[in-house]
Amino acid sequence: MERANHSVVSEFILLGLSKSQNLQILFFLGFSVVFVGIVLGNLLILVTVTFDSLLHTPMYFLLSNLSCIDMILASFATPKMIVDFLRERKTISWWGCYSQMFFMHLLGGSEMMLLVAMAIDRYVAICKPLHYMTIMSPRVLTGLLLSSYAVGFVHSSSQMAFMLTLPFCGPNVIDSFFCDLPLVIKLACKDTYILQLLVIADSGLLSLVCFLLLLVSYGVIIFSVRYRAASRSSKAFSTLSAHITVVTLFFAPCVFIYVWPFSRYSVDKILSVFYTIFTPLLNPIIYTLRNQEVKAAIKKRLCI
């Protein structure tokens, strides 16, 4: 390969979720349904927010972008995993693997920052309601959105820069259904201990900073809401609870994946499935069930 004279691995073999043929068929059917649900659920939110003028507010603008990221994030690994359930030999090219890792980290990092932006939006809406539309202006929203993608791009680029310097000259079997960076690094033909620490530090620092910002934002909001009228507090907590649920679902797998990133336990596969597939599926459900405005707009759009 032209990438490096000492690198001879041109493809990687993915072991998938299970070697059982019966389970392969079951997984194929199950994950096909789940993937369709991801696309339809997030697409429904995108269309509803775009075409319903009542939802043209900062909160729903950010929510529609979250749905877009979730839909694209699931699309980078899930379709290939579904097709691989029907294949005896599951392979992916080196550049295909590299692209998969790059976009997974790009979108994952962007989603973390977008969740922070959504927490800021809720803080302004609940703690400074009279100045909400002034503070959360289109210019501010655009800045928050672009900052989210910029941070995701820098995070992903720094992670992938490590990969370009690694020689792969022998082992090429990845015990997962997609190219997971910690697992790919282990296959390099050199000592990668320092590199493993750098990868953990990079992802861990971004996750920690975002998580702390979210904790501070939600802490201030909850403290503020305690002293509001009961009716207003109920509505505020209803909106806030959906955000907290989504944040918990997003960060919980990250904690396990990056606290024990180079372990060989099968729990890593379960967490990866949850992070890349079930979180994008659950997000639109959570926001729809907890939000009367979205439910009403969807019913109107579907003529129910």
UniProtKB/Swiss-Prot annotation:
Highest taxon above the source species: Eukaryota
Keyword Transmembrane: yes
Transmembrane segments: 26-49, 58-79, 101-120, 140-158, 196-219, 236-258, 270-289
Matches recorded under InterPro entries: GPCR_Rhodpsn (IPR000276), GPCR_Rhodpsn_7TM (IPR017452), Olfact_rcpt (IPR000725), Olfactory_Receptors (IPR050427)
Annotated glycan sites: 5
Residue ranges that the UniProt entry lists as topological domain Extracellular: 1-25, 80-100, 159-195, 259-269
Keyword Cell membrane set for record: yes
Cytoplasmic side: 50-57, 121-139, 220-235, 290-304
Family as reported in the entry's similarity comment: Belongs to the G-protein coupled receptor 1 family.
The protein's name: Olfactory receptor 4K13
Organism: Homo sapiens (Human)
Source organism phylogeny: Eukaryota, Metazoa, Chordata, Craniata, Vertebrata
